[in-house]
Amino acid sequence: MAVPRNRLSNARKNSKRAHHAKKPKSLSICSNCGTARLPHCSCKACGTYADRTPTTQEAQ
């Protein structure tokens, strides 16, 4: 089993993890209603995805 040669101080340990922060989510703008939405997902406000309106089982 591997054993560390020297103990890392808290400052060195935390500075190694400085680049591990989460990146903010990139948002797209809905072309139908103009609200912010996640890319590759349907709009939560109007329900459109890729300029298509949602169809329900009742409508079919």
Swiss-Prot record:
Composition skew (Basic residues), residue ranges: 13-25
Residue ranges of the region described as Disordered: 1-27
An example Gene Ontology CC term for this record: large ribosomal subunit
Coiled coil: none
GO-annotated biological processes: translation
Keyword Electron transport: no
Keywords: Ribonucleoprotein, Ribosomal protein
Pfam (any one): Ribosomal_L32p
GO molecular function: structural constituent of ribosome
Keyword Chloroplast assigned: no
Superkingdom classification of source: Bacteria
PANTHER family associated with the record: 50S RIBOSOMAL PROTEIN L32 (PTHR35534), LARGE RIBOSOMAL SUBUNIT PROTEIN BL32 (PTHR35534:SF1)
UniProt record similarity statement: Belongs to the bacterial ribosomal protein bL32 family.
Designated name of the protein: Large ribosomal subunit protein bL32
Protein species of origin: Protochlamydia amoebophila (strain UWE25)
Gene name per UniProt: rpmF
